Amino acid sequence: MQVLHVCSEMFPLLKTGGLADVIGALPAAQIADGVDARVLLPAFPDIRRGVTDAQVVSRRDTFAGHITLLFGHYNGVGIYLIDAPHLYDRPGSPYHDTNLFAYTDNVLRFALLGWVGAEMASGLDPFWRPDVVHAHDWHAGLAPAYLAARGRPAKSVFTVHNLAYQGMFYAHHMNDIQLPWSFFNIHGLEFNGQISFLKAGLYYADHITAVSPTYAREITEPQFAYGMEGLLQQRHREGRLSGVLNGVDEKIWSPETDLLLASRYTRDTLEDKAENKRQLQIAMGLKVDDKVPLFAVVSRLTSQKGLDLVLEALPGLLEQGGQLALLGAGDPVLQEGFLAAAAEYPGQVGVQIGYHEAFSHRIMGGADVILVPSRFEPCGLTQLYGLKYGTLPLVRRTGGLADTVSDCSLENLADGVASGFVFEDSNAWSLLRAIRRAFVLWSRASLWRFVQRQAMAMDFSWQVAAKSYRELYYRLK
């Protein structure tokens, strides 16, 4: 079974979000599971520099100009690169300029990505041809459409990492991307009078996956579907929509081997976690005290992530004696709000604006509770890292958060399945009630340690996801 992942980023070569983490880990897990998985990426500068052994496979003149297809390896995974400097050789973000305006030629830049993905199934590399083209998010959404236009030389899977980003472009660009105008149809890639790369992936793929079972159900509902609910409900009825949970890359996220921690530990040596907490309290300007629970946030500061709820609930958390360490950036109003809280509550609130991958490990190793109060969350990786590190997740019941965290209810504690704290409603009162439950459990140290060990024993490895995808691919053949 030969599978080509078509996508726009891959950790650690280039990362703007969780998609990169998935592509950085899933193909390697699939190779270990017996699938010949490779990755197709645009040759953005950081990616091109990272794949040092790239050799020319093919040269083509395309609707988007001349391209060179390269092939090399990164961490044991075969990587195809679309080398087109006029499209991809730009500093900074792969999607927008320094003023945060989307590049005006994004329609060509990402149509080309889908086109090359489909051409791979027609022999662009004469020595390797995929049985399945697995496209990820809107950037690769045209790959299933190009395959359909070519008579489907390979099966296609389209994975939705976040339905909110739809890849919308003016209709006249149909003239530029070499797809038949007949595809510009409500039964095709047309959406609200425009081309939607996302809808192209949803409509033309043989199978759609979402990054958690709950999110796969949620996106059939109007409040989560952004206008795509009719199509997604149809795909669900046809058995062509399912959810596969993302995993944790244990080579990077494991408290037993994490060199970024002051003190490494396992579920059997959790007492060694205390030194990480002490170091984190010092680094964030918090009072060094192992008797108080340290809550943490590692997140984009947006209302989608529920960070406005944290700001509203913060006085209640602090009144009970808790501390907060926050690492993130985003909405300027939220940034100012958290900075003001740090100034008002010195020793109890520490805030670092920005994102630093290394420091996020130190927070995960040192905190007692990781807050993930998202309004919607397709899968979420932060809570999975929390489980792995014995940093109990406090989450809202949505998307992948609902699939991965079991509340510390009396029943779950008795059954030995509790792993965190879950609240229902997207408001500060509901969040505060969950925070209160965390304080109650914290006051029972042996029970807290029991839940930590239970959380750390859960298996969210990429091997589980790789097996699920392998079974899906074989069903499509």
UniProtKB/Swiss-Prot annotation:
Q: Which domain of life is it from?
A: Bacteria
Reactions catalysed, as given in the entry: [(1->4)-alpha-D-glucosyl](n) + ADP-alpha-D-glucose = [(1->4)-alpha-D-glucosyl](n+1) + ADP + H(+)
Does the record bear Magnesium in its keywords? no
UniProt KW Transferase keyword: yes
Keywords for this entry?
Glycogen biosynthesis, Glycosyltransferase, Transferase
Under the heading Pfam families, the entry gives: Glyco_transf_5 (PF08323), Glycos_transf_1 (PF00534)
Under the heading Gene3D superfamilies, the entry gives: Glycogen Phosphorylase B (3.40.50.2000)
Entry's Gene Ontology molecular function annotations:
alpha-1,4-glucan glucosyltransferase (ADP-glucose donor) activity; alpha-1,4-glucan glucosyltransferase (UDP-glucose donor) activity
E.C. number: 2.4.1.21
Top enzyme category: transferase
Pathway(s) annotated for this protein in UniProt: Glycan biosynthesis; glycogen biosynthesis
The residues that hold ADP-alpha-D-glucose are 15
- SUPFAM superfamilies reported for this sequence: UDP-Glycosyltransferase/glycogen phosphorylase
Q: Enumerate the InterPro entries for this protein.
A: Glyco_trans_1, GS/SS, Starch_synth_cat_dom
A biological process from GO: glycogen biosynthetic process
Output the CDD domains linked to this UniProt entry: GT5_Glycogen_synthase_DULL1-like
GO CC entries: cytosol
Q: What does the sequence similarity comment in the record state about its family?
A: Belongs to the glycosyltransferase 1 family. Bacterial/plant glycogen synthase subfamily.
Role of this protein: Synthesizes alpha-1,4-glucan chains using ADP-glucose.
What is the name attached to this protein's record? Glycogen synthase
Taxonomic source organism: Shigella boydii serotype 4 (strain Sb227)
Which gene underlies this protein?
Answer: glgA
